[in-house]
């Protein structure tokens, strides 16, 4: 005797290439859920440059958190952070790096930030319309300074879409982060102000799991990663833990008020 399959186990659910009657690709939707479970990453653009920040979590007493990377250099003028499945993110980041090298060799100049985001989004899109593959369960934030000096931040989604933002967050804390961006982001922010805003946001997210404010502040330098690219130098720079701690110490009273 044959039994009907539950609605959540229909063909639309199993195949990445079949639309449901509602117009959904369920596997793509599920890939978005993988992103929402990831550690939070942020991108902020200012007139002085861009800031990339990411959350790192203590996942076990034997794990060396200092060797966990959430922010990567794509080229001198572009950095990237991700949320979702780390292996998927690594593959796409390597693809973006190879693309930028080829672009420099062919055209003698670095590619615009949007072009790098687009080619990665194109790869993601291709994995939503071919059999035998699954969508990438990762979202990426590309932030950088274009050859003409303009600053850009892009988010690429599992379905192949990419969007430009002034400030954006992805991952498990994206709702908290984006609400804080809407309240506190200004287009005339300095790079220093953007860096402090990123730290405030990540502190607020960490406080969701750490009740004691003093402990959250003390562990903040261990649980965040920060990088920036200035319009003047156009050189990807990742901050050391000591540099992050210095900034955290300078804004201690502000953090205690959150």
Curated annotation (Swiss-Prot):
PANTHER family: PROTEASOME SUBUNIT ALPHA/BETA (PTHR11599). Belongs to the peptidase T1A family. The 20S proteasome core is composed of 14 alpha and 14 beta subunits that assemble into four stacked heptameric rings, resulting in a barrel-shaped structure. The two inner rings, each composed of seven catalytic beta subunits, are sandwiched by two outer rings, each composed of seven alpha subunits. The catalytic chamber with the active sites is on the inside of the barrel. Has a gated structure, the ends of the cylinder being occluded by the N-termini of the alpha-subunits. Is capped at one or both ends by the proteasome regulatory ATPase, PAN. PROSITE patterns: PROTEASOME_ALPHA_1, PROTEASOME_ALPHA_2. The formation of the proteasomal ATPase PAN-20S proteasome complex, via the docking of the C-termini of PAN into the intersubunit pockets in the alpha-rings, triggers opening of the gate for substrate entry. Interconversion between the open-gate and close-gate conformations leads to a dynamic regulation of the 20S proteasome proteolysis activity. This is Proteasome subunit alpha. The keyword NADP does not apply. The gene is psmA. It holds the Pfam family Proteasome. GO terms for molecular function: threonine-type endopeptidase activity. One of its GO terms (biological process) is ubiquitin-dependent protein catabolic process.
